Design a protein with these regions (language model features):
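Residue-level recognition of single "structural anchor" positions
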Residues: 1-187
Length: 187
């Protein structure tokens, strides 16, 4: 699936351990999770059991999410190039992995969350065009949907993410959902 027009990119760090697999936990040389266990600081990776989920959402349209081993420019570049049409306006936060978007052929604008900037009006018409609030809203919906599952295995996380992406992308189809589901199963 490709997205175009105005696209927002962002990353979120989930919690996905080795639920139901105590042998994997012991192999890593640590005790099982305990309530209120303080984690390590910094950004997440699969090894730290804080897998990064990278998302791209077209404003008013489709979303594409990918589970990554870590978040680096070399990891997101092929994902972005395969998903976003060149020349598209891409909105991000200030994270340095997005620094080369213009070099890759995209019109890039960013907001600086670290400075308290969450939306910006660049053309003075009173509408804040530069923001990643659509993607942040999607992450909020995803977290709310995952919360009742009370922990997810790293092995199953891609299935949960794929299902939620599918549900989000077909939510407006109504009766056309069945043909879309059949098409997905056939391909």
């Amino acid at each position: 699936m490709t997205v175009s027009k105005a696209v927002e990119c962002d990353e979120v760090y989930g919690i996905a351990g080795h639920k139901g697999r105590p042998e994997v936990v012991k192999k890593k040389g640590r005790q099982g999770r305990r309530r209120r266990l303080k984690g390590k600081g910094g950004r997440g990776t699969l090894e730290k059991e804080r897998p990064p989920v990278f998302g791209m959402i077209q404003r008013g349209g489709q979303v594409v999410i990918n589970l990554l081993a870590n978040v680096q420019q070399k990891m997101i570049e092929p994902v972005i190039k395969a998903t976003i049409v060149p020349g598209t306006r891409v909105y991000t936060d200030e994270y340095s992995i997005y620094a080369h978007l213009q070099r890759w052929g995209y019109a890039h604008k960013s907001v600086n969350h670290g400075q308290g900037e969450f939306a910006r009006d660049d053309d003075g018409d009173g509408v804040c065009e530069v923001h990643v609030n659509t993607m942040e809203r999607f992450w909020s919906l995803l977290r709310s949907w995952l919360r009742p599952h009370r922990g997810i295995s790293q092995e199953k996380l891609p299935l949960y993410l794929g299902f939620f992406e599918f549900v989000h992308n077909v939510r407006k189809r109504g009766k056309a959902l069945l043909p879309a589901l059949i098409e997905l199963l056939v391909t």
